């Protein structure tokens, strides 16, 4: 996840265990792991939804990457791009912002790149970028940057 690309001590999730209830067998461990992942995803989304001044929740999926690392790098390049986040706040489908952010991250973008998004007018926006270079993908959760974000951080004391 990324709200503004900055690390904050205010948004954290801790997972603690007393080890008092042992997990028995692979089936129990798999179920426990699945449920922990579900809770972590819900908490991650909640942190983004509660981002300072955020008006939109944005799910970015980079697919068709050569490697998992490239997919993750591409996702964070968009999630941390002020120009991309401002364009989404303005409901402006300026896909040049996406290509520029990927290029800045060192990802070569082919001419046949595919970019799709749900309606930018909605509170929840999904952006899918297909690099068409391989079989890896990664999803990042972020939010837009708004005038309220600037106001909150300009007046911070």
Roles of regions detected by a PLM:
Residues 1-157:
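A structural signal for small-residue-enriched, beta-sheet-centric alpha/beta enzyme cores
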């Amino acid at each position: 996840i990324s709200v503004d690309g900055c690390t904050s001590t205010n948004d954290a999730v801790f997972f603690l265990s007393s080890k008092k209830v042992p997990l028995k067998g692979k089936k129990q461990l798999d179920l426990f792991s699945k449920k922990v992942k579900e809770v972590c995803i819900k908490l991650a989304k909640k942190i983004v939804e509660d981002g300072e001044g955020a008006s939109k929740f944005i799910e970015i999926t980079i697919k068709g990457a050569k490697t998992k690392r490239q997919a993750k790098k591409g996702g964070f390049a968009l999630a941390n791009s002020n120009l991309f986040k401002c364009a989404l706040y303005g409901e402006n489908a300026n896909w040049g912002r996406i290509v520029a952010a990927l290029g800045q991250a060192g990802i070569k973008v082919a001419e046949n790149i595919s970019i799709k998004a749900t309606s930018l007018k909605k509170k929840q926006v999904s952006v899918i970028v297909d690099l068409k270079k391989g079989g890896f993908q990664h999803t990042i959760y972020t939010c837009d940057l708004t005038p309220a974000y600037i106001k909150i951080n300009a007046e911070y004391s």
